[in-house]
């Protein structure tokens, strides 16, 4: 295969490869802009089943994703702690963090979001890491013989992300308010399972997304309180030296986490 030197050419190759795989013989006029090409590629990658993939495809995908991802990297050492020297609150794109592990809010099927171009964290992490993550997750599910339970944690490589690893956890889904004690405990269990797994793997740092607060509808204020309380208790009780980043995306979540730490200091 001729070496593809531009990310635009790589996108076109990957799109054509996935269309061939789907037996899609319709005439396609390739979009002219990189953004439109990316959206087409991402949508196809999102809905692609966890099937074997060629070495050629992986080589092109990895060259493109690693190049795109290294253009936007946030190093943990550039962040300022909010408490002590090991707890951080940071607003930004978790997929840009150069860190030992980021946490993905997965669903029970555990294959990543399969809705084309959906803007949930599960979709974005899988898209930017590469198809290998879906294949790894599928193998985890195959070996355990059932869907992933709420509150557990599993680890995969980060592949093309700046993060070395991805820790996947399934949070509770809220269908009615107020949130039950069971669902509060299950959310806390998500954080505990991720922390324990990180320590078992001898990781130095971990970044949490806001688990269950998206389509799973856990109230953001309650979720922030549970996250902060659970992490602080774990670090204190275990004497863990893990550095923990609470990653937020919205201004509202940033404010809620700051308020949670302010209340904790009172």
UniProtKB/Swiss-Prot annotation:
MF (Gene Ontology): hydrolase activity, acting on glycosyl bonds
Enzyme class: hydrolase
Pfam families, sorted: Macro
Cofactor list: Zn(2+)
Positions with a binding annotation for Zn(2+): 113, 118, 120
Domain called Macro: residue spans: 74-265
This enzyme's EC code(s): 3.2.1.-
Residues engaged in binding ADP-D-ribose: 93-94, 107, 120-122, 212-214, 216
Catalytic activity: 4-O-(ADP-D-ribosyl)-L-aspartyl-[protein] + H2O = L-aspartyl-[protein] + ADP-D-ribose + H(+)
Assigned keywords, A-Z: Glycosidase, Hydrolase, Metal-binding, Zinc
Co-factor binding comment: Binds 1 Zn(2+) ion per subunit.
Family matches, as NCBIfam families: PRK04143.1
Role of this protein: ADP-ribosylhydrolase that specifically reverses the SirTM-mediated mono-ADP-ribosylation at an asparatate residue of GcvH-L, by releasing ADP-ribose from the target protein. May play a role in the regulation of the response to host-induced oxidative stress.
Family (UniProt): Belongs to the MacroD-type family. Zn-Macro subfamily.
Name of the featured protein: Protein-ADP-ribose hydrolase
Species annotation: Staphylococcus aureus (strain MRSA252)
């Amino acid at each position: 295969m001729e070496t593809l030197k531009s990310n635009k050419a790589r996108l076109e190759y990957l799109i054509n490869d996935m269309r061939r795989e789907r037996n899609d013989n319709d005439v396609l006029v390739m979009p002219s802009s990189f953004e439109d090409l990316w959206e087409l590629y991402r949508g196809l990658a999102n809905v692609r089943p966890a099937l074997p993939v060629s070495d050629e495809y992986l080589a092109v995908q990895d060259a493109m994703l690693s190049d795109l991802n290294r253009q936007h990297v946030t190093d943990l050492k550039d962040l300022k702690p909010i408490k002590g020297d090991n707890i951080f609150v940071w607003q930004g794109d978790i997929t840009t963090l150069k860190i030992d592990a980021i946490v993905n809010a997965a669903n029970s099927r555990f294959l990543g979001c399969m809705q084309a171009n959906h803007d949930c964290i599960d979709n974005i992490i899988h898209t930017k890491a590469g198809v290998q993550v879906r294949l790894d997750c599928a193998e985890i599910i195959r070996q355990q013989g059932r869907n992933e339970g709420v509150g557990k944690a599993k680890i995969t490589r980060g592949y093309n992300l700046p993060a070395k690893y991805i820790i996947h956890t399934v949070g509770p889904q809220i269908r009615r308010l107020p949130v039950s004690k069971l669902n509060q405990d299950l959310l806390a269990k998500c954080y505990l399972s991720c922390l324990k797994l990180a320590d078992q793997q001898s990781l130095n740092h971990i970044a949490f997304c806001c688990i269950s607060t998206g389509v799973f509808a856990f109230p953001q204020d309650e979720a922030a309180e549970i996250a902060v309380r659970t992490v602080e208790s774990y670090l204190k009780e275990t004497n863990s030296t893990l550095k923990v980043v609470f990653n937020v995306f919205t201004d509202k979540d940033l404010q809620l986490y700051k308020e949670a730490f302010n209340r904790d200091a009172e």
